């Protein structure tokens, strides 16, 4: 019988404050930020230093009955080693007899999915800026041999400066030398190679950000259909259409990412250098500078 990791043994707990280990008593717990299948996330701050963070509280019994204990181990192992401005930091973790606590960076802008639902779709400038940020974050992950495999608005957060942050690494893997064949991720975002049950590589993340870019601009994924069979059929064929309002530059980028053959998808560097992305970044910078100048002028007038 396979041994459970120490963190998941139901009788296992670390002694509060012994050997520098944390406990829940070191934090003031605030409002809930979100709820998942295996627990909840709360706003919190440390009692000493008043450092704001988010605490993900997971129940061991639910993780074990859901068979995802190794997925959590992997998430902790991967996320604790990632430091990038567009990736949520995992600062620390600890556990008691029943729960596991992940101490995460707090993203005051909240969930990308909620923003997209409220706004229906993002402006071109915002979508382009987000595409640059996610391409930069994934380039960093891929250099460390980490494939995310579950990029979607629900797994993205917005930081204090309005920047995109990748927030959930539950499905990610360290890319081995041989290619993987596990089916994972969200149906609308699955690439053809996964739908066909073929091996896959880090190119799955390229397909996913193509879907993401489309959803940012249109408000729904490109392969969304009433039933699963039609969705899968459209994904396998790379078959989708654009509403008239999606402009040429965005179509060009999306078309270079949503390529059925994973070897022919454009690279993350090509996403960052794409003329549409760079022009949208320039628009965002100009708008930010204008806003800053207007704020400074209004302060002078008072």
UniProtKB/Swiss-Prot annotation:
Residues 27-277 form the Protein kinase domain. Coiled coil: none annotated. PROSITE patterns: PROTEIN_KINASE_ATP, PROTEIN_KINASE_DOM, PROTEIN_KINASE_ST. SMART domains: S_TKc. GO terms for cellular component: centrosome; chromosome passenger complex; condensed nuclear chromosome; cytoplasm; kinetochore; midbody; nucleus; spindle microtubule. It is an enzyme of class 2 (transferase). GO terms for molecular function: ATP binding; ATPase binding; histone H3 kinase activity; kinesin binding; protein serine kinase activity; protein serine/threonine kinase activity. It is found in: Cytoplasm, Cytoskeleton; Chromosome; Midbody. The keyword Manganese does not apply. Keywords: ATP-binding, Cell cycle, Cell division, Chromatin regulator, Chromosome, Chromosome partition, Cytoplasm, Cytoskeleton, Developmental protein, Kinase, Meiosis, Mitosis, Nucleotide-binding, Serine/threonine-protein kinase, Transferase. Serine/threonine-protein kinase which mediates both meiotic and mitotic chromosome segregation. Required for histone H3 'Ser-10' phosphorylation. Phosphorylates tlk-1 and zen-4. PANTHER family: SERINE/THREONINE-PROTEIN KINASE IAL-RELATED. Interacts with zen-4 and icp-1. Part of a complex containing at least air-2; icp-1; csc-1 and bir-1. Interacts with tlk-1 and bmk-1. This is Aurora/IPL1-related protein kinase 2. It comes from Caenorhabditis briggsae. The gene is air-2.
